[in-house]
Amino acid sequence: MARIAGVEIPSNKRVVIALTYIRGIGIKKAQNILSDLKEIDINTKVEDLKEQHLIAIRNKIQNGNYLVEGDLKREVALNIKRLMENGSYRGLRHRKGLPSRGQNTRNNARTIKGKRRTKNTVANNKK
């Protein structure tokens, strides 16, 4: 297995698919990276790549202004924190743990709202 951007990419897959194992790189970005590197064919498997090709891919990702892995997570977290500090509607929804993109919450939204909690009502307290 080759290590690129701190991620072990599988050696039995094609390079374009293996690059998508890196957070922040999808199919399109992987194709763009490989199209800039003329000597690497998109259909080549990772195990068939030479060390110089792996170094070229690493350099392209590092120097190509791609936000990957930890940097991407940090950027997203800072964006959410900025929204919450601004007091914007989206920030308030994040703070309350509710969907921030306009979805209905009457019936669904269990993923973001979390597990149901029973309220302390008079009926629950009587025993």
From Swiss-Prot:
Belongs to the universal ribosomal protein uS13 family. GO terms for cellular component: cytosol; small ribosomal subunit. It holds the Pfam family Ribosomal_S13. NCBIfam families: uS13_bact (TIGR03631). This is Small ribosomal subunit protein uS13. It comes from the Bacteria. The gene is rpsM. InterPro entries: Rbsml_uS13_C, Ribosomal_uS13, Ribosomal_uS13-like_H2TH, Ribosomal_uS13_bac-type. GO terms for molecular function: rRNA binding; structural constituent of ribosome; tRNA binding. Part of the 30S ribosomal subunit. Forms a loose heterodimer with protein S19. Forms two bridges to the 50S subunit in the 70S ribosome. Located at the top of the head of the 30S subunit, it contacts several helices of the 16S rRNA. In the 70S ribosome it contacts the 23S rRNA (bridge B1a) and protein L5 of the 50S subunit (bridge B1b), connecting the 2 subunits; these bridges are implicated in subunit movement. Contacts the tRNAs in the A and P-sites.
